[in-house]
Amino acid sequence: MLSEIRLIEVSTSNIHFKHTPLKSGTNRGNFEAEIGEITVEAGKKLKSDEALSIIEITASPKVVGLSTTSDGAIHETFNLQFGLRLVFTYPDSIDLTPELLDENRWFFEYNVKIFFKTQCEQIIKPTTIKNIELPFG
């Protein structure tokens, strides 16, 4: 089944990015990242080709940067959240059951993680935030 699935669209929406630069006396920090709930919708027809149906994956991932001051206080240095939408096509010859989707959920989650990482890096790149390596992908 997976060999016949094609990614045709990746989009982001509702980007929220807040950056509070590190203050002097602040040590290096860390970050927390989460993908959030992933929703899967399947079965709609592709408008440009009726022989194909689509799988639409949506998620609302976020990553939060944290730093610790010399007195032990923890501060949020950045917060990035956005909506992520991936659209895949598959031929109508595949009987896409809920069980088949569940068996292959890992594939869709992996793609969400890859594009989450890519989008985060692109948004953070022009800022003063450096040397963050998201573990996804």
Positions of the model-derived regions?
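N-terminal intrinsically disordered, cationic/polar leader segments
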Residues: 1-110, 118, 122, 126-137
